[in-house]
Amino acid sequence: MSIKDITIVITSFKSDEIIRNCLNSIDNQCEIILVENSNNIDFKTNLEKDFKNVKCFLTGENFGYGKANNIGLNKVKTKYALILNPDASLYPSTLNDFISSIEKVPDFAIIAPFNQDQKNQNNKFEERNLPPMPVNNVKGFAMFLNISQFKDVGFFDESFFIYFEEMDLCKRLINLNKKIYLAPKVKINHSGGQSHNKSINEEMELSRNWHWMWSTFNYHKKHKGFLVSLLIVFPKLSSALIKVIIYSIIFNKNKRKIYYQRLSGLVNAISGKNSWYRPKV
């Protein structure tokens, strides 16, 4: 096996300020499938011109994390794929370390890097050269997928626009006795929370708060039922309502917006509406 057997799948949305750092970190022998959640033809043209191993697909609208990744994954022709966020980057040894990890657990469905963020890079576990360790779920910013393991489970549930889609996928894999691992040897640099241009931070923050609450309720509803999910989110619902009232009284417009988004996301989820909210950018 070589790194040519791995396809990188990246989903982006207005990420032109940061995407090049990610792409520059990837060996040019790897095919990169980039799914851009817009109709930005200049973004596609410039990247495909500068990176010969990149194929950029424009969705025409913002499909979110799960559906856009599914578009990319369904175009993969290699045995393995690496889902990578645009605010993440590879170290020179990342792909070869992944290959050596595969040899220890060839039956894996997902392998994720042990250092889930930069704070963990000096973790003692990384120094021990441990084999991949079985887990029940991993974070979605970087996941190596064994494509053949997904024939009977599918990829992401597209009803989730953002958040909890990787937890849902891991849950479905575990339910079918598929194997998920953390690999201490595999390192990926992840800046976190900045997968888009800084100019749209405020609107993206509103969108994140809405979808975090919507996805929280619907993930638990899907796997535990409506009533259990309602019990789980009720404290969040009450807190959001109280804070909307408080911040309205003291004229804190920014805080009121945030908690209104949380309240709206939960109310829409509880009432059975889909994840319709999109950032206004």
Predicted regions, residues:
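Short, well-formed alpha-helical segments that are part of the catalytic scaffolds
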Residues: 12-28
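Short aromatic/hydrophobic "clamp" motif used to bind/position activated sugar donors
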Residues: 81
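Non-catalytic, C-terminal membrane-associated alpha-helical segments of glycosyltransferases
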Residues: 207, 211-215, 226-281
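A short, conserved alpha-helix in the catalytic core of glycosyltransferases
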Residues: 142-145, 149-154, 159-189
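Glycine-rich, basic loop-to-helix element that forms the pyrophosphate-binding segment
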Residues: 59-76
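Short beta-strand/loop segment that forms part of the nucleotide-sugar
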Residues: 30-39, 57-59
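Conserved donor NDP-sugar-binding/catalytic core segment of glycosyltransferases
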Residues: 91-123
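A conserved acidic beta->alpha catalytic loop
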Residues: 25, 36-45
